[in-house]
């Protein structure tokens, strides 16, 4: 089983990575280049850079992979302007979902860990959201 965890350097994301490793999954962690990898030291973790601001870039970055599970935990929790919060959280999620759909990636489950998940419900209707 192959899993991708976005926001893997965050508090919740790092625990999801830890649990995936414990269950023996091939674990891929998407973190920003500037993020700390302090809690992601296990040598079994594979790292991937994902540009959530560009659907086209996401397609290129994801194309070599076929993930069984994707846990999307990346997002901004603090922004000076509401537009930035929307752009990072809602648009970034939309780009990720559209890239996966365009690639036809046969994932088994897409898990969205967001407080604004209702805003993007229409892009997720093809998958089960937990």
Where are these regions (language model features)?
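N-terminal Rossmann-fold cofactor-binding loop
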Residues: 30-35, 51-52
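NAD(P)H-binding glycine-rich loop region in Rossmannoid oxidoreductase-like domains
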Residues: 46, 50-95, 99-102
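Short beta-strand/turn micro-motifs composed of small residues
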Residues: 7, 31, 114
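Conserved Rossmann-fold NAD(P)-dependent oxidoreductase catalytic core, especially the SDR/UDP-sugar
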Residues: 72, 91-130
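Short loop/helix-cap segments at secondary-structure boundaries that form the rim of catalytic
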Residues: 36-43
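N-terminal Rossmann NAD(P)H-binding glycine-rich loop of SDR-like oxidoreductase domains
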Residues: 1-23
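Residues at the starts of beta-strands that form the adenosine-phosphate
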Residues: 2, 26-28, 106-109
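Conserved beta-strand segments of alpha/beta enzyme cores
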Residues: 26, 44-46
